[in-house]
């Protein structure tokens, strides 16, 4: 897991082989988003606001599990 400087997101991990993006949120909860393209995972890590990028590009767009 990679720690990110965000008010909403604590850590992020991406497995390119399975296209699974794991996000651990600051206020608890770990979610695994399925079939996330590498460009989206890279975008999350590179974004000036990780929380905004998550909201705009990941939330409600990918199937997830806890």
Predicted regions and their residues:
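Acidic/histidine-enriched, beta-strand-rich ligand/metal-binding domains
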Residues: 1-66
